[in-house]
């Protein structure tokens, strides 16, 4: 059985650029139609090294053509690409603490860096769904469906400079970025 691997499509790059701007080297991103780990569930994507590994049943030729939940999922995975490319140890962080919570609490005074690796993925994908897709029903944290202003306050530093490593999750893993 042939393994499919591809780069991002022009439409995927255009979509991801709405959120990440020039902070990602899009030509480096690979999408694989295979599991990264043998135990990876079918409905799971792993993005440990700047490339996405979807089970063959979830692999699409262009994720912009997917339904809104699939686009949300793709943008969550693009957040891990962004983290990896900025130097965050996504693979190490995922291995050390399997099961990081995806849940997040938006609050004034918080920044994107206050959230863990997985929560950042959902927070950014939820913001994308609200701001650009106008589809609050696909958000993981639907209670923030009317909180675009709060998202933009929390994301102010990221929106001003998505390429800044200061946006990465705080803690030991981020300190490794500076080492």
Model-derived features: positions:
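Short pre-active-site segment immediately N-terminal to the catalytic Zn-binding motif
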Residues: 22, 42-44, 53-75, 111-115
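Short, solvent-exposed loop/turn segments at secondary-structure junctions
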Residues: 32-38, 52, 58-60, 79, ...
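Active-site recognition of the HExxH zinc-binding catalytic motif
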Residues: 72-84
